């Protein structure tokens, strides 16, 4: 087993820690209306961990048009990263429409980026450009739309800012790794890119679910403060 496969298995083991944090969070929220809503956080470390086990054995790694794509990596990202950004919106108290919007933007960024991996020439860079547009729209949700609706509750503001900046900083790194790797300008090796992605994925997902556990007091109230737009709807209905 080579260094990359070993790193993949190491990443899978590290993600078990994330599963433990979600389990502890779920147990600590017994009786809270947020308990069931936060349960899908488990998908993040579980799906990513299983994907890494598959990647370690080259499952889903294929050649398309002469270009290698680690299929399970993109399937993992397509499943888990929309959940990551969606729960940032949930922590902000954003509307369901906004949460779905940021999740769709993230999913399209990943899907179009995968298309850029298996194409060449002008089409590759056109797809990279489209993926970058979805990337920028995702940042608009994180840094413009969501901050407008966070209730004036210090604990909730603190959790939102922590999640927002954690995801925001890491989401800047991923396209740079892609750009310098074999799929982009080819300045980094496939092995180097693979090892970097393992590091980024574990760093993105395990601390993320830990933050929810560490700041679980936010979700222990009978109900969280409504977002401004929700409050407006409720006030209008009452009138």
Swiss-Prot record:
Membrane-spanning parts: 4-25, 35-56, 71-92, 96-118, 123-150, 154-181, 190-222
Parts of the chain on the Extracellular side: 1-3, 57-70, 119-122, 182-189
GO cellular component, one term: plasma membrane
Residues recorded with modification N6-(retinylidene)lysine: 205
UniProt topological domain (Cytoplasmic) ranges: 26-34, 93-95, 151-153, 223-239
SMART domains attached to this UniProt entry: Bac_rhodopsin
Keyword Phosphoprotein recorded: no
Entry superkingdom: Archaea
Topological relation to the membrane, as annotated: Multi-pass membrane protein
Biological process, per Gene Ontology: phototransduction
GO molecular function terms listed in the Swiss-Prot or TrEMBL record: monoatomic ion channel activity; photoreceptor activity
Gene3D superfamilies for the chain: Rhodopsin 7-helix transmembrane proteins
Keywords attached to this entry: Cell membrane, Chromophore, Membrane, Photoreceptor protein, Receptor, Retinal protein, Sensory transduction, Transmembrane, Transmembrane helix
Annotated family: Belongs to the archaeal/bacterial/fungal opsin family.
Assembly and binders: Interacts with HTR-I.
PANTHER family the record matches: BACTERIORHODOPSIN _OPSIN, NOPA (EUROFUNG), PTHR28286
Function, as annotated: Involved in the control of phototaxis. Mediates both photoattractant (in the orange light) and photophobic (in the near UV light) responses. The signal is then transmitted to the sensory rhodopsin I transducer (HTR-I).
This protein's name: Sensory rhodopsin-1
Species of origin: Halobacterium salinarum (strain ATCC 29341 / DSM 671 / R1)
